[in-house]
A protein has these predicted regions:
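C-terminal, helix-dominated tail/subdomain
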Residues: 145-152, 163
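A common structural junction motif
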Residues: 103-114
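C-terminal soluble interaction/assembly domains
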Residues: 110, 122, 156-157
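Hydrophobic alpha-helical membrane-association signature
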Residues: 98-102
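Non-catalytic beta-strand/loop surface segments
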Residues: 1-36, 47-96, 118-128, 139-143, ...
């Protein structure tokens, strides 16, 4: 028997209070199955948002000293997946403020799209990371196996070609379609050592 998760109907939130040293804000949105054409736009969007010193969330959160690090998760699956931004807060920073900055960064792309430079940089980063990840027979076998798990081995062979075909409008369209409240789940990890949030 094979079942599918029902469509999400409205925003979800969770706060975890436990012992720890680093507070975290995570903002997740539902994504389509990995073989959907929007997967490639999501991959590039994750690069634009959080990969490298020129990424938008780096400039919005790391450079001003609001967060110590970022992590973006957008791994494709056979079923629906998640597009998640994680921000690891500097001591004393406010969870709500960090969440708003992440969402405002999304909204800027929803409203105004991305630049040509951002698109080309994201594609170059992707090509480099894919080449590195396919270095060696074990790595190639593992990547093909992942493609099979998603549902089609040609996901491996056509990935870069489809990345190259993504346009600025594709990324803006994906942001408008998926980065919405009805597909959003927000999580806060609040350390018991931090009483400021």
């Amino acid at each position: 028997m094979y079942t599918e998760e029902p469509n999400q109907e409205g925003e979800r939130r969770i706060t975890v209070n436990r012992n720890g040293q680093t507070d975290i804000v995570a903002v997740a949105h539902k994504t389509p199955p990995g073989l959907n054409k929007d997967t490639y736009s999501f991959h590039l969007l994750s690069k634009i948002l959080a990969d490298g010193k020129s990424s938008r969330l780096q400039k919005a959160l790391i450079d001003p000293g609001l967060a110590t690090s970022l992590f973006m998760y957008d791994f494709p699956f056979k079923d629906n997946g998640l597009f998640i931004s994680y921000a690891f807060l500097n001591p004393g920073e406010n969870h709500k403020n960090i969440e708003e900055i992440i969402l405002n960064t999304y909204k800027e792309i929803i409203d105004n799209g991305i630049s040509d430079d951002e698109l080309q940089r994201a594609k170059a980063q992707t090509k480099a990371s894919v080449a590195f990840s396919r270095d060696g027979s074990y790595a190639v076998a593992s990547a093909i196996n992942e493609a099979l798990a998603i549902g089609d081995w040609t996901f491996y062979t056509t990935f870069i070609k489809k990345i190259n075909s993504v346009t600025k409008n594709d990324i803006k369209s994906v942001a408008n379609k998926y980065l919405i409240d009805n597909k959003k789940t927000t999580g806060w990890f609040v350390s018991n050592n931090n009483e400021t949030n």
